[in-house]
C-alpha cells in the first residue's frame, strides 16, 4: 500500500500529517488482511522526529518535520550546556542539526509549555506502534538518533537530559 507522505506547512512550520499517515497505515492493514492472517508487523519511518504526549496519552501539538527550520542555531544553545566534542564523545552520534537533541532545544526555547506539559515522548514509528497497540515503547536503534542515548548502557543518558534541562519523562 503506497501513499503520498508530503509534509504540511502551517504558519511557516513544516509538520508531518500523522493523522493522514495513520489512516493510510490502517488502510494498508485492511488490504493485507485480504490475503490472510497477519502474523506480525513492523513499523519503520524516518528517525529523529517525535510526538509529545500528555498525561492522558493525547498528542501535544503536531509532529514537526526534521526539515523544518526551527532547529537553526539550536546547536549553539545545546553547546552552552555541553561542548560539541564532549557530546559526540558521549553519544557517538554524528551531529545533524535536525537530530532530536536540537529539536527538543527548539521546543524548550520556542514552546517551553509543551515540554512542561509532556509526560512522555515517542519517536514517530513508536507513536504509530502505540496507536495500533496501546503500548508505549522506544525502539533502541531509532532512539539513538535522538543523540540522547548512552551507547554503553543502551539507555537514555539521564545525566545529559538533566544537563540540557529536558524532562526525564
Annotate each PLM feature.
Residues 17, 41, 68, 107, ...:
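Residue-level signal for inorganic ion chemistry
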Residues 87-169:
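Gly/Ser/Thr-rich active-site cleft segment
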Residues 21, 25, 71, 100, ...:
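Conserved donor sugar-nucleotide recognition element shared by glycan-biosynthetic enzymes
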Residues 1-62, 89, 117:
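N-terminal glycine/serine-rich phosphate-binding loop of ATP-dependent small-molecule kinases
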Amino acid at each position: 500500500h503506497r501513499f503520498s507522505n508530503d509534509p504540511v506547512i502551517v504558519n511557516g512550520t513544516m509538520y508531518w500529517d500523522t493523522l493522514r499517515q495513520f489512516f493510510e497505515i490502517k488502510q494498508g492493514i485492511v488490504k493485507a488482511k485480504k490475503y490472510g492472517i497477519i502474523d506480525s508487523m513492523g513499523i519503520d519511518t524516518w528517525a529523529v522526529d517525535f510526538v509529545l504526549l500528555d498525561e492522558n496519552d493525547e498528542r501535544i501539538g503536531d509532529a514537526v518535520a526534521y526539515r523544518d527550520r526551527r532547529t537553526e542555531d539550536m546547536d549553539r544553545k545545546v553547546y552552552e550546556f555541553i561542548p560539541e566534542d564532549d557530546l559526540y564523545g558521549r553519544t557517538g552520534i554524528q551531529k545533524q542539526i535536525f537530530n532530536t537533541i536540537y529539536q527538543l532545544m527548539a521546543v524548550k526555547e520556542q514552546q517551553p509549555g509543551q515540554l512542561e506539559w509532556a509526560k512522555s515522548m515517542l519517536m514517530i514509528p513508536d507513536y504509530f506502534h502505540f496507536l495500533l497497540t496501546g503500548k508505549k515503547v522506544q525502539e533502541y536503534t531509532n532512539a539513538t538518533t535522538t543523540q540522547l542515548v548512552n551507547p554503553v548502557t543502551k539507555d537514555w543518558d539521564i545525566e545529559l537530559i538533566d544537563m540540557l534541562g529536558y524532562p526525564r519523562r
